[in-house]
Amino acid sequence: MSDGAFVEQEGLDGLVAEIRACRACLDAPLGPPLPHEPRPVLRVSSTARILVASQAPGTKVHLSGLPFTDASGDRLRKWLGVDKKTFYDVSRIAIAAMGFCFPGQDAKGADLPPRRECARLWHDRLFAALPEFDLILTIGRPAQAYHLKRLGLGHLLGTGLTQTVASWRQVRASRNDTRVYALPHPSWRNTGWLKKNPWFEADLLPELQADIAASLDRAERVCKGRDKSDRETATWPK
């Protein structure tokens, strides 16, 4: 790691420590307080070039402290075409949800939406401190709304999740420096959605897997010094 990258990571580590110590959803909540002790979960680094921007941890992740340690994670890794070792290599893949803590469940046992405190307090600071990403995978409506607007792509946000995901080719090609994907949550609750929208697995996933592989390969070549191109100005081929 270069001296500049070390300083960048050191500053990021301080911000992540602040986030992991956050208790705003108990001490200064926007609405009902969190029904349990906070446990913010995120994995970021100054070198990762793929961002998994998800919704919020579930019950298993709240206990493990590691994102996607559940059936949803198994399905997501299958979608991406990566194994657990690659997925959890924080030097290559960052994982940052819209809500860092498990938000609790409703009366029917479904997970509540991400807490609003996280985005308001932390997200702008966090993504300003992180490098530009090759790929941003926005999972679920809250992540899509935040990141598409942050990237100046708010006009591509559909009236609902299906419309946004169905516009994936337009969303993907909207920037030269970063490819953005809008994805449904990989929860079993969306199995019916996947059956109703077979184009997702037939058309979108092969392109997503190819982009994941290309980004990982480019990062590997840069790391080994075989690619001398400036990462700050790197663009995707048309």
Residues of each region from the PLM?
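Catalytic cores of phosphodiester-bond-cleaving enzymes
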Residues: 238
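Ala/Thr-enriched low-complexity intrinsically disordered regions
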Residues: 233-235
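Intrinsic-disorder-associated, low-complexity terminal segments enriched in Asp/Asn/His/Tyr and depleted
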Residues: 227-230
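A polyanion-binding, active-site-adjacent surface
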Residues: 2-219
